[in-house]
Amino acid sequence: MHQFTLAEIARGLADKSFSSEELTRALLARIKQLDPQINSFISVTEDLALGQARAADARRAAGETGALLGAPIAHKDLFCTNGVRTSCGSKMLDNFKAPYDATVVAKLAEAGMVTLGKTNMDEFAMGSANESSHYGAVKNPWNLEHVPGGSSGGSAAAVAARLLPATTGTDTGGSIRQPAALTNLTGLKPTYGRVSRWGMIAYASSLDQGGPLARTAEDCALLLQGMAGFDAKDSTSIEEPVPDYSANLNASLQGLRIGLPKEYFGAGLDPRIAELVQASVKELEKLGAVVKEISLPNMQHAIPAYYVIAPAEASSNLSRFDGVRFGYRCEEPKDLTDLYKRSRGEGFGVEVQRRIMVGTYALSAGYYDAYYVKAQQIRRLIKNDFMAAFNDVDLILGPTTPNPAWKLGAKSSDPVAAYLEDVYTINANLAGLPGLSMPAGFVDGLPVGVQLLAPYFQEGRLLNVAHRYQQVTDWHTRAPNGF
């Protein structure tokens, strides 16, 4: 059963080939057996899962239907889950049990999904390798000496290892799409405001967005259907009708205009990845797409702008973790200042402390205009570049990452080298656009992804193109040895 996609599970549950409880028990056993090799879970919620599975079976027996009813899910460990540890991969929240469900968790539970656990992640979602977690690094199932990408590395590794068919992730600068590329998955970052952020512990509030990780575009469509929608509890949620994401998966690509930004194919891109991207372009041309070169002239400014804006927002968001109301508290503080200083110094890891310091500096009185205001101006230029490009093309295509997965620890001492791995993904977050990564081949036995970007609220078109591509290629069907 572990080889089934989410769509296959939906069909199997509907025709009563197996029950949700049988499926849940099989996957829980598989997690217990295999997860110690990859460390993709922080918490496994066995009792919760079995209770939800029995409830889903009862709902189905009573005549209820639904693609997600009784299907398994695991949540990135920054989605609050009622009564379950929600740690953000940090010592700071190691003892925090959320008193409520995040909107995403609640919506998927209402749809009947079964929560198998909470997945490992870079601490407070800050990282590109899933090495900064308090609970240890996650390993890439394709090569256990390599990283799975981040920050949703646990969510990606769990699906790649066939521990379950789909997981939730979040994407602030590429944290769904980059691990999807490095583990041979399909990962979708929706339009900013498409999926509620209520109960999703914040890193950078103007950039964070939740989305699905799965093996196929068809599965991402099913999961996004359950996640998307307006939420009055989230002030950044957008009141836009949610289409049927599965309805147009098979639509023709005849005449679809795809733009290849010339800036995506310059220095820094592994030439073998460039070849795989061009091969995927040829497949889409065979399906009827028309491809042309375009320009995104301000792309080179994206990383510096992002690494001012995101840490600035993080320094503000993470100021709430002070050892007073919840989270880690240091032993025997001498006074209030000592409580704050030691609780934060001991509770946060090195990368989180680095970004808090950078953000605080960028927001300080003497530097606010020089850094934060300037970064927001660059953000506007990047958005304008995309708007101009989408006057000429329907979608933008390029590599998801400049390199395949690197070895564990290879970039730990050089944070900027790791930051540069997000060079192709950050732009979509700065502009708030939807983006999808899909499997496109292998380099040295390690997966490579191709990224598609679309105008606002065109997730359906991204899923359509990825699905048609996956009907004529088999990269997404390949599984790592031993899993």
From Swiss-Prot:
Reaction equations catalysed: L-glutamyl-tRNA(Gln) + L-glutamine + ATP + H2O = L-glutaminyl-tRNA(Gln) + L-glutamate + ADP + phosphate + H(+)
Class of this enzyme: ligase
GO molecular function (one): glutaminyl-tRNA synthase (glutamine-hydrolyzing) activity
Pfam families linked to this entry: Amidase
InterPro entries, sorted: Amidase, Amidase_CS, Amidase_dom, AS_sf, GatA
Enzyme Commission designation: 6.3.5.7
GO biological process, one term: translation
Gene Ontology cellular component terms for the protein in this record: glutamyl-tRNA(Gln) amidotransferase complex
Active site residues according to the UniProt entry: 76, 151, 175
Alphabetic keyword roster: ATP-binding, Ligase, Nucleotide-binding, Protein biosynthesis
PANTHER family named in the record: GLUTAMYL-TRNA(GLN) AMIDOTRANSFERASE SUBUNIT A, TRANSAMIDASE
Oligomeric and partner information: Heterotrimer of A, B and C subunits.
Function: Allows the formation of correctly charged Gln-tRNA(Gln) through the transamidation of misacylated Glu-tRNA(Gln) in organisms which lack glutaminyl-tRNA synthetase. The reaction takes place in the presence of glutamine and ATP through an activated gamma-phospho-Glu-tRNA(Gln).
Family stated for the protein in its record: Belongs to the amidase family. GatA subfamily.
Protein name: Glutamyl-tRNA(Gln) amidotransferase subunit A
Organism: Pseudomonas putida (strain GB-1)
Lineage, uppermost ranks: Bacteria, Pseudomonadati, Pseudomonadota, Gammaproteobacteria, Pseudomonadales
